[in-house]
Curated annotation (Swiss-Prot):
HAMAP family: Trp_synth_beta (MF_00133). It comes from Novosphingobium aromaticivorans (strain ATCC 700278 / DSM 12444 / CCUG 56034 / CIP 105152 / NBRC 16084 / F199). It catalyses: (1S,2R)-1-C-(indol-3-yl)glycerol 3-phosphate + L-serine = D-glyceraldehyde 3-phosphate + L-tryptophan + H2O. Belongs to the TrpB family. It is an enzyme of class 4 (lyase). Its EC number is 4.2.1.20. This is Tryptophan synthase beta chain. The keyword Amino-acid biosynthesis applies. Pathway: Amino-acid biosynthesis; L-tryptophan biosynthesis; L-tryptophan from chorismate: step 5/5. CDD domains: Trp-synth_B (cd06446).
Length: 404
């Protein structure tokens, strides 16, 4: 662990799960004992060298970590400014960053003696990662997925079923991630005695935002060491896409106390911030959803509105509470990118580097495309390539007018 200083950006949440005014735990009374139990177990696991050893061993031999740090020479040349580097988390087993967190949480579930796993999923990546760890450890798995997402992420739905998971399509609301999460929370309340809920992003009631961040911060810890070893210094700018925000907080957190490192989180602007989008920091205001206080997309009456993004993994109408706090104190900058800009960036990376990214990190690449030309050639941008694009080729083809 890094030594904490009193004025560190890295020592929150407080004991009640707050990041400034954000976070907390707003849950049904039936869930509160379980949430407190989870917090106790997590604190015990953090102090247990055997837990860390098992987590690290699985990350190395099952997930394939550390993931490479890659300098993108042709993209750098094309953009004509700062050097562009990628943390290649799309090379993990299952093709995204989600597995880092699932490994940590299933170890916690088994430590707590739970025998059934549930999860929500949007793009299907977290569902696939959860189904994967359940198969690996022989536990039954139920995945709640919005009916809209089931339709647009057919390959991942089939993967989950192949891995032995039961996939429950959720038709409530718009049938997307928010609705799937509501349904998962309902199931958890009803089956609290034997069920562990593996939340897929750095949101939800405390201690979830903290533990998801801690499991994902392997990304930033590796990247920091790799960057120092390869270049002898830290990057000038970190860039990551944000839905709920777990890949971004995983990259950012180990660098928060390095004042020379700027950070940029990239939300989904969808059709535009004045139209349908999923940029809760840019277009939302504080409210309470899924057990925590954070920025949310809501109407005048405080009803949660639907997020829209070409990327199924970014259309959550909220954001992890730590990001809300980091925005409020000004430590991290946040911007947003439209569907069209993300599609252009998706194609740019394919053509320049031979890497097909997921639509989620394509948003980060679109932001890099804007900012790199404004920086010096001796400056370094490190972007998190948090998922591969296999799952998205059908929807990209459709948007480009190609029938497969």
């Amino acid at each position: 662990m890094t030594a904490q200083t009193p004025n560190s950006f890295r020592n929150l949440p407080d004991e009640r799960g707050h990041f400034g005014q954000f976070g907390g735990r707003y849950v049904a009374e039936t869930l509160m004992p379980l949430i407190l139990d989870l917090e106790r177990e997590y604190n015990a696991a953090k102090a247990d060298p055997a837990f860390k050893a098992e987590f690290d061993d699985l990350l190395e031999h099952y997930v394939g970590r550390p993931s490479p740090l890659y300098f993108a020479p042709r993209l750098t040349e094309e953009l004509g400014g700062a050097q562009v580097w990628f943390k290649r988390d799309e090379l993990n087993h299952t093709g995204a960053h989600k597995i880092n967190n699932c490994i940590g949480q299933i170890l916690l579930a088994m430590r707590m003696g739970k025998t059934r796993i549930i999860a929500e999923t949007g793009a299907g990546q977290h569902g696939v990662a959860t189904a994967t760890v359940c198969a690996r450890f022989g536990l039954p798995c139920v995945i709640f997925m919005g009916a809209t997402d089931v339709a647009r992420q057919a390959p991942n739905v089939f993967r989950m079923k192949l891995l032995g998971a039961e996939v429950v399509p959720v038709t409530a609301g718009a049938g997307t991630l928010k609705d799937a999460m509501n349904e998962a929370l309902r199931d958890w309340v009803a089956n609290v005695h034997n069920t562990f809920y593996i939340i897929g992003t750095a949101a939800g009631p405390h201690p979830y935002p903290e533990l998801v961040r801690d499991f994902q911060s392997v990304i930033g810890k590796e990247a920091r060491a790799q960057m120092l070893s390869r270049t002898g210094r830290l990057p000038d700018l970190l860039v990551a896409a944000i839905g709920g925000g777990s890949n971004a907080i995983g990259l950012f957190h180990p660098f928060l106390d390095d004042p020379s490192v700027r950070m940029l989180g990239v939300e989904a602007a969808g059709h535009g911030l004045d139209k349908e989008h999923a940029a809760s920091l840019a277009g939302g205001r504080p409210g309470i959803l899924h057990g925590n206080k954070t920025y949310l997309l809501q109407d005048e009456d405080g009803q949660i509105t639907e997020g829209h993004s070409i990327s199924a993994g970014l259309d959550y109408p909220g954001i992890g509470p730590e990001h809300a706090w980091l925005k409020e104190i000004g430590r991290v900058d946040y911007t947003s990118v439209t569907d069209t800009e993300a599609l252009d960036a998706f194609q740019l990376l394919c053509r320049t580097e031979g890497i097909i990214p997921a639509l989620e990190p394509a948003h980060a690449i679109a932001a890099v495309k804007k900012v790199a030309p404004t920086m010096g050639k001796d400056e370094i941008i490190l972007a998190n390539l948090c998922g591969r694009g296999d799952k998205d080729i059908f929807s990209v083809a459709e948007h480009l007018g190609v029938s497969l």
